[in-house]
Amino acid sequence: MNISNKYGLRNSPPVRTSDGLADEAHPEMGMASKLLCLFPSSLVNYLIALAAIFSINFILPRLMPGDPLQAIYGQEALVVMSDEMEAQLIRQLSLDKSWWDQMLAYILSLMQGDLGFSYYYREQVSQVILGALPWTLLLTGLALVLATAIGLILGIESGYARGSSLDRGLVAGLMFLGGFPDFFIGILLLLIFAVSLQVLPISGATSPYAGHEGLAHIADILKHLALPLASMILVQLGGIFLLTRNTIVTLLEESFILTARAKGCPERCIKYAHAGRNCLLPLTTATGLRIPQLLTGALFIEIVFSYPGVGSLLNTAIDARDYPLIQGILLVITLTVLTANFLVDLLYSRLDPRVRYAH
């Protein structure tokens, strides 16, 4: 019998809080609050970091001793600066104006996507970088996804079979590989598979003058990508594997794992659905920390394999002392790292509701 009916009380309507009334009266406010929840509270920190990056990128070239034009194109430069080029550089960089005017012109140029002019390639810096950036993003993106997936699976299997020969072999082997830099592993793979066995191409991203189209072109790209990608995966695999394995070893002693076993859940379900899913939070945090390392490793790997990415472009710009191009590359790399870390923060707040509710 209902207690309220027993004492002659009517069922009271559900209580509506002030937040609920506000959402009903102003549905756009509720939608706005939901949209704000999509962004982490550290957005202000990213904006401050972005402003600091722009400031450093503006100030550093102007702190060079002597004439900035001679600092950029002196006697050691591979490109001789003509009078027309000097006048264009002074006008473009606003070197005949005050620092505040130069800063304003710099910010306006960035807002318009103008990163300067490359005097080695005789082209806009943004166009030069856009030609190389997709190759670097392809290499680092695939390395990040594949290394994370393989490391997650191997870590779960190894942690679940702790103390076995499989566990000991994986720990020893992946720790050994993780101790080498990316470019060293790349040189070894290059000597074995490209020079000795001659089963994979030695350099480049595509076969020149091959005329491949469709699936043949994709297969050619993947064939050239195999060695650089394998070099980065082998080095990154150790850290992901150890983090996942240690997390699994800790989780197997938790009460919810014992409860799942007591309910009769299959071991495969416990391994991946219960223990494996809880590895995603620390793995997501580690991913944000590994992105700068991945990009740095990709720069050296591209030089080893003559891969036409941002790393090879930066090497050429340094040799030619093309400072506008160097500035543009460093700015794009830094913005890529900031954007990737921001997306990781967003993903973390989606995976762990406690982070959302804490703010």
PLM regions: where:
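Transmembrane alpha-helical segments of polytopic membrane transport and secretion proteins
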Residues: M1-Y46, R162-G163, L346-H359
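An internal, D/E-rich "acidic patch" concept
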Residues: P27-L35, L95-L152
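Helix-terminus/capping and membrane-interface signal
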Residues: E28, A49-N57, W135, L139, ...
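Alpha-helical transmembrane segments of integral membrane proteins
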Residues: S33-L36, I129-L166, Y209-H359
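Hydrophobic residues within alpha-helical transmembrane segments
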Residues: P40, V44, L142-L146, G173-F176, ...
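Hydrophobic alpha-helical transmembrane segments of membrane transport/permease proteins
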Residues: L50-W100, L197-I218
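Short hydrophobic, aromatic-rich alpha-helical segments embedded in or entering the lipid bilayer
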Residues: V80-Q112, F305-A317
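Membrane-water interface segments at transmembrane-helix boundaries in multipass membrane proteins
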Residues: A172-G238
